[in-house]
């Protein structure tokens, strides 16, 4: 039906006869000559309809509406110099049409304009309700093309590194120690349920036991969890696993993979190896295990300096085993008012969202003098003040913000304020496409964290991460040493966002059982839930490890978008709904009966 794509035509095609198909982006009538901007997925080109080419052709063109689907034949010619459009790649040429056929008409009114000439914002709800129209817009076309380029580059790289692409099951079993599963009832096995995979974790480990050695998959994953801008109930992972590789070898190969993607998509040569931070160092310096290193304001622990000054908020936190930490805002005296820091202010509100009950602050004046509340100023001696200013690197005109309490809350508070103030003070362009790509690895995570609600340890990543061998010690000390051991786990962070992560895996069945016992799974339950894995580990499992990247998030960053919904063809809302198909939806009583399910939910009419 067509000989060329609209956006691929150039001056070299002048005098060529072409057949084009696409949508009418807009139509203009100028003094008896009709101009049509014809659009397909590659771009737009100007079509000229001259009445000299025939009255029937002209009549059809006169009645065209935007988004009508057409086929046009004609000859490419140069535009007059005064009418060239340098903003378009096809702006130096046009097609003089000699044939126009309407392939499909528009019925009714469009819910929003799709034209490349219309930049008026459209509500996301409307875009998602009519996603098939939104996909025609240049923004979405570019994002999906970019997504394709990322996948193509990743596949090519992994093929060259001798990886096999292997699919793992979508219908699997529900296992503990993860997010909430999406469950699927079995009609054949009455009363039993499948779960949709949260990741291919156990299957890719079994592939390593099976001797595949190097595996990858563009994996669909499902998690029934509360959503935000960078989360979806179903999402895509670039999933990788390999045998007989050390942690450093895995990180090195991953850096080459990421570098190949950035080079292909952005033309950027990334410098690697990427910096490494231990988990503890990241928490100490940034208050988070996903640090953004494009700006300063690093956390400083000033507990030792301030523990004896007589300010109950500080001393009480320290005496209770917590800490006092702070961040320094360069030039903050001029940039931030007291009103913003006190109750009711936006900075105070951000701190409250992280769990803080209050904020303290010091303004640094000339000659090392400070302004602060009396309870701090009156009890801070000269030596303490000098040491505080030295440790915080604070100078005249700077503002120091303090948080006190349990260390976890203090870290969350200052990490949140650090990110909020970086955006508020425009320390970095927050459109995320500023070409500043600060990659880093966070390594040496704790194996476990304490779940106070359930009064037990739980795996910080998952219970299949291998512990650091130097922390583990001899076999008889495993149960004693495991709770405080570090995991051989690693996360890749870019500009404050986690791109993905992984670990070396446990390949010793006894150690795996001990880890499951540590998180509170009795022997019989462990064998019931993970017996297939434990049995496989007894059959000569090789040392192995891997990682997974969130494809949607990578594309979001590369595209300069603020939500992964703009990188997915048919995303869900933050309520996990598809506005286009109105899923999820009720099913018939007959379907429920076949599945042996009775609903107890009473729907409000």
Swiss-Prot record:
The record marks 30 as: Important for tRNA non-discrimination. Disulfide bonds: none annotated. ATP binds at residues 223-225, 232, 498, 550-553. Keywords: Aminoacyl-tRNA synthetase, ATP-binding, Cytoplasm, Ligase, Nucleotide-binding, Protein biosynthesis. It is found in: Cytoplasm. Pfam families: GAD, tRNA-synt_2, tRNA_anti-codon. Its main location: cytoplasm. The keyword Phosphoprotein does not apply. The keyword Aminoacyl-tRNA synthetase applies. Residues 201-204 are annotated as: Aspartate. This is Aspartate--tRNA(Asp/Asn) ligase. L-aspartate binds at residues 177, 223, 461, 505.
């Amino acid at each position: 039906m067509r000989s060329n794509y609209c956006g691929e035509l150039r001056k070299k095609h002048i005098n060529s006869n072409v057949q084009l198909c696409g949508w009418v982006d807009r139509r203009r009538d100028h003094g008896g000559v009709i101009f049509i901007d014809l659009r397909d997925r590659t771009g737009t080109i100007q079509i000229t309809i001259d009445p000299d080419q025939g009255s029937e052709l002209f009549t059809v063109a006169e009645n065209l509406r935007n988004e009508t689907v057409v086929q046009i034949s004609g000859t490419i010619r140069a535009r007059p110099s005064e009418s060239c459009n340098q903003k378009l790649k096809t702006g130096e040429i046009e097609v003089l049409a000699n044939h126009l056929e309407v392939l499909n008409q528009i019925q009714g009114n469009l819910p929003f304009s799709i034209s490349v000439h219309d930049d008026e914002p459209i509500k996301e709800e409307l875009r998602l309700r009519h996603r098939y129209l939104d996909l025609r817009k240049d923004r979405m076309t570019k994002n999906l093309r970019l997504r394709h380029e990322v996948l193509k580059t990743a596949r090519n790289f992994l093929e060259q590194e001798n990886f096999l692409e292997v699919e793992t099951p979508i219908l699997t079993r529900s296992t503990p120690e993860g997010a909430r599963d999406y469950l699927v009832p079995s009609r054949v096995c009455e009363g039993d349920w499948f779960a949709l995979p949260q990741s291919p974790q156990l299957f890719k480990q079994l592939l390593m036991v099976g001797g595949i050695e190097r595996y990858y998959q563009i994996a669909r994953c499902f998690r029934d969890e509360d959503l935000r801008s960078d989360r979806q109930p179903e999402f895509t992972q670039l999933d990788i696993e390999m045998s007989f590789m050390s942690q450093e070898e895995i990180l090195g190969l991953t850096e080459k993979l990421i570098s190949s993607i950035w080079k292909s998509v952005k033309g950027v040569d990334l410098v690697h190896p990427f910096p490494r931070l231990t988990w503890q160092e990241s928490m100490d310096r940034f208050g988070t295990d996903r640090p953004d290193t494009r700006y300063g304001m690093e956390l400083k622990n000033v507990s030792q300096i301030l523990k004896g000054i007589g300010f109950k908020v500080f001393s009480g936190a320290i005496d209770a085993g917590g800490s006092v930490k702070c961040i320094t805002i360069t030039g903050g005296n001029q940039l931030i008012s007291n009103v913003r820091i006190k109750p009711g202010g936006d900075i105070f509100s951000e701190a409250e969202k992280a769990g803080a009950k209050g904020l303290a602050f010091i303004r640094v004046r000339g000659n090392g003098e400070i302004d602060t509340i009396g309870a701090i100023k009156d009890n801070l001696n000269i030596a303490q003040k000098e040491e505080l200013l030295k440790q915080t690197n604070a100078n005249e005109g700077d503002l120091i913000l303090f948080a006190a309490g349990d260390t976890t809350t203090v870290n969350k508070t200052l990490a949140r304020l650090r990110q909020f103030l970086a955006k508020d003070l425009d320390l970095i362009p927050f459109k995320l496409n500023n070409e500043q790509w600060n990659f880093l690895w966070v390594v040496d995570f704790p194996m476990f964290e304490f779940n106070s609600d359930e009064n037990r340890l739980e795996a910080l990543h998952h219970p299949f991460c291998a512990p650091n061998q130097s922390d583990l010690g001899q076999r008889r000390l495993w149960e004693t040493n495991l709770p405080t051991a570090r995991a051989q786990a690693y996360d890749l962070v870019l500009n404050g966002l986690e791109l993905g992560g992984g670990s070396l895996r446990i390949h010793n069945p006894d150690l795996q059982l001990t880890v499951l016992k540590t998180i509170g799974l009795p022997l019989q339950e462990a064998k019931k839930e993970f017996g297939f894995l434990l049995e496989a580990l007894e059959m000569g499992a090789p040392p192995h490890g891997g990682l997974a990247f969130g494809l949607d998030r990578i594309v979001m960053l590369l595209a300069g978008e603020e939500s992964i919904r703009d990188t997915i063809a048919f995303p869900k809302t933050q309520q996990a709904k598809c506005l286009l198909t109105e899923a999820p939806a009720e099913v018939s009583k007959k379907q429920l009966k076949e599945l042996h399910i009775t609903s107890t939910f009473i729907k409000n009419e």
